[in-house]
Design a protein with these regions (language model features):
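Extreme N-terminal basic, low-complexity initiation segments
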Residues: 2-10
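Active-site helical microenvironments for divalent-metal-assisted chemistry
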Residues: 11-12, 18-285
Length: 285
């Protein structure tokens, strides 16, 4: 579904955006900078939400760089669609949103928006370095290299070797964070894929990406990747468990509160300072 375009228009478009963005103090910042995008306000592919998140922790200059990356990516991916029919640029914006929610830096967010341009368009790594600097180009290159290695075995020993190989290839932790966010959004939109491909990607997610997220201590990614992998690999089991858990949700919460209170009383009786935190297990666990 993807079509390549010559790199010339991409780099020319990005170069034309090197001047600072105009800012109307009578409008909110997100509305001001989004109003200048092609096709605005008809569609922003998630950029309004992204900009609003970025405003909470990045400078205007950093957000302007990310907006330039969006226009560079939109030009590079022009005419490309995902299996769902959505414009392709909506995917890297969603990946960037995941990282913005974690308050990653401007370079990582920029790389997230550009992460598929080298592999899937005729924009080059040199174009990215020229427009956004060597740091962003290095992150995009790192993600592209991870995309080139293929997982082919379900054997646990080989899966572990594959995880070690991926982690060994990474010189910057932000590379794997972009890749994990990329995988998460792909899993969230996996329904548009053929059944066989869904199963393969779900297995790969459970064997490779969820364990890496766990190893890095990114519990949110781990939980979401595991549940989504489970949903697509074992859909019947997932539906049965999901239905059962929804029925018993109230009882589970009461049980967690009760057990937490019992532990807290025991600690107090023994004069032990501590904090007890209870949580409900997610579906895959």
């Amino acid at each position: 579904d993807r079509r390549l375009i010559p790199p010339g228009p991409v780099t020319a478009r990005a170069a034309s955006l090197s001047t600072p963005l105009g800012y109307d103090r009578g409008m909110d910042y997100a509305a001001t900078i989004l109003a200048r995008l092609p096709g605005a306000p008809r569609r922003d592919h998630g950029m309004r939400q992204l900009v609003e998140t970025l405003e909470t922790y990045l400078t205007r200059e950093q957000i302007e760089m990310i907006m330039r990356a969006y226009e560079f990516g939109a030009a590079a991916h022009k005419g490309q669609t995902r299996k769902s029919g959505e414009p392709y640029i909506s995917h890297p914006v969603a990946v960037a949103q995941e990282l913005a929610d974690m308050h990653l830096d401007a370079q990582a967010i920029t790389a997230a928006i550009l992460h598929d341009t080298v592999e899937d368009t005729e924009a080059s790594l040199e174009d990215i370095e020229e427009q956004f600097g060597p740091e962003v180009a290095g992150l995009v290159d790192g993600v592209s290299k991870l995309d080139q290695i293929q997982f082919r075995s379900r054997a646990e020993a080989q899966a572990e070797s594959f995880r070690k190989m991926m982690l060994a290839m990474i010189e910057d932790i932000r590379v794997i964070l972009v890749k994990l966010a990329d995988r998460l959004h792909n899993m969230q939109t996996l329904g548009a894929m053929p059944a066989e491909k869904r199963s393969r990607i779900a297995r790969e997610t459970l064997d490779i990406y969820a364990p890496i997220a766990n190893r890095l201590g990114i519990n949110r990614f781990k939980v979401l990747l595991e549940d989504l992998g489970f949903k697509h690999l074992y859909p019947m089991r997932y539906r049965v468990l999901d239905k059962a858990l929804k029925r018993s949700k109230g009882n589970q919460r009461q049980m967690v509160k009760k057990i937490t209170a019992e532990f807290e009383r025991t600690l107090e009786e023994e004069n032990i300072e501590g904090q007890v935190i209870g949580r409900e297990k997610h579906l895959y666990s």
